[in-house]
């Protein structure tokens, strides 16, 4: 969020530090606020019947007549026919964006939203769809429309994890949230407090027996971490650090050390997130939120002892909401069924950008694996066992649990052989195309695949999007692969829930990274046939990158509250027709973060010149401590920063902060807060700046660095200064970057060089090193924020959340 909270009371001008320019923040007018209010209310508790009388009356019809649309195509006709025949996916059924029939229907519904001539037509169709069409399909189509309609710039929906929390939190938490009853909660004890013995008394046998049974319920077994039984020393167990709350303690199980149970408790304090201090000192924000009853519940990540494997220790990362949301929104921005010409996606080099993101996400995942002593991502094969099983422990909103995969699962044995032949046939075909270096289309046209820009063609093929050449063949392979993983038949309509069928859930599964590694390998296979960069190509005459000083790199686990109010099942409260949002539910979870860091460049230049400065992060050693050669290691580097700068003649000292990174975002403003801001502005009490929340397309800033080690994990950074090569449109010149992602604008990228340059091609180390490059050895330290609580005698506030803990780590880790 790029504004100060004080701006809510008056319009101002802010400085966008990342881009070194002053930017006027736009403020919403009444018409905009009416639209924003509608979007927030129409997805409120989307699985439940619509309760807003205004929208119920509005949604009594759906405009199927062509005159209400700027374009009317075959998908819209087919959708209308399916609606008349009652052949649409029913409400309450699982929706999979990568299920063939679901995707076709979703495309038809999206077109009705996207091509609506005016807001009234759009709003009427949305209200009707909310009441009568499948919930998952509705949100999918609506999200695409809000992102891609040119006249919707600045309008937002709640984050996907706030619309459908069920896709991001385990079934135990979801069931507790959905059965939350405020009246019952008021009548019962606020806490079922499970205290440690605060006064350090030796327990009686009965108290020991109670604790022992609870320990069994938590699955802790009968032994200590030292192998000693509770029976032998139950009288002194409270005097040691081996109390059951610490027995199976992991960093993200913080509530055990505070004596809190996994149930709802109420706090009048502020919502936790990393930028909350911008708000909780502001009187307007405090006034706005004072009447909201806030309830919190600790939530864990999934760790299934029955399907335990080495990937289980990474669940805090693979199940991170920001990590999964990034992939979801990338595939909303560049949806496989949106053509590049109509939506302008070709202006953004959509195929290359999608494929480069696959590579970058795999690089980031690989670095997290190294933090835990794990090595390369395992190779994927359709004809070998998948060693790593996975149980997502998710439950769909219709009550059906997600399917799971056992360890050493054989894809070939349990699959549909016809589908498998088509999938493997595609993979073999594209590998042959890359090796041959050309492709002959059905009309006999020859396409040269030995040019660098041909990576766009390869990317479109691998994503299976509609811009792929011969898209009848290439478009469906990607969808078929995901359907095969989910054991879903080609013509199946009602599908069992599976994480691999939706973008927002698939990154939870270790198999995702194995499969997408096979996709990235085609990218590297293509690059193998391009000539290596020569010293002359890499050299920037007159520019020397003399030194880079990097500040301390520290990661830690912090706490955050995610808004899960959409899972409430109680009665909605209305006053004079106006909805009263009087209570909110929050999932309190521990997640990976890092201390802000910076680096300072010392660059000598022989002349004034506009340049682009790039920064990469990568491993230095493999899991066995062996140094990785640059030739092999180039594939493991992740680009963390790029920006333009005008060098002056002589020495240039440039300081760059992690908070300046253009591609990352902080925590998004919660659904509850956004709705209150909208209503207050609608009533004329506040101004509503359009940059009120972070753009949806940003990568989580807190996940830039891998976890690292307590003693320090050796890594390396690479920096390079290159001449500025202008893209088709200057970056951010055609859209407002403070609230828009500029999808299809052609102005998203800093220059026209290939993504990942200079690591995109294979390296000749004799030619590679030039004065405008700089390698820097760095160390990433992991700080244990819960360490002070390990000795229970130092903590006396059991059964309550310790807000001083949040203050302490905020001060310690967020200040440079």
From Swiss-Prot:
SUPFAM superfamilies given in the database record: Di-copper centre-containing domain (SSF48056), E set domains (SSF81296), Hemocyanin, N-terminal domain (SSF48050)
Signal peptide from the UniProt entry: 1-16
Localization per record: Secreted, Extracellular space
Pfam families cross-referenced by the UniProt entry: Hemocyanin_C, Hemocyanin_M, Hemocyanin_N
Keyword Membrane: no
Keywords of the record: Secreted, Signal, Storage protein
Tissue/organ expression: Larval hemolymph.
InterPro entries named in the record: Di-copper_centre_dom_sf, Hemocyanin/hexamerin, Hemocyanin/hexamerin_mid_dom, Hemocyanin_C, Hemocyanin_C_sf, Hemocyanin_N, Hemocyanin_N_sf, Ig_E-set
CC annotations in GO: extracellular space; larval serum protein complex
Record GO terms (molecular function): nutrient reservoir activity
PROSITE patterns tied to this protein: HEMOCYANIN_2
Entries under Gene3D superfamilies matching the protein: Di-copper center containing domain from catechol oxidase, Hemocyanin, C-terminal domain, Hemocyanin, N-terminal domain
Protein's GO biological process: energy homeostasis
Family in the record: Belongs to the hemocyanin family.
Function: Larval storage protein (LSP) which may serve as a store of amino acids for synthesis of adult proteins.
Family matches, as PANTHER family: FAT-BODY PROTEIN 1-RELATED, LARVAL STORAGE PROTEIN/PHENOLOXIDASE
Assembly and binders: Heterohexamer, composed of three subunits, alpha, beta and gamma.
Stated name of the protein: Larval serum protein 1 alpha chain
Organism from which the protein derives: Drosophila melanogaster (Fruit fly)
Gene symbol of the encoding locus: Lsp1alpha
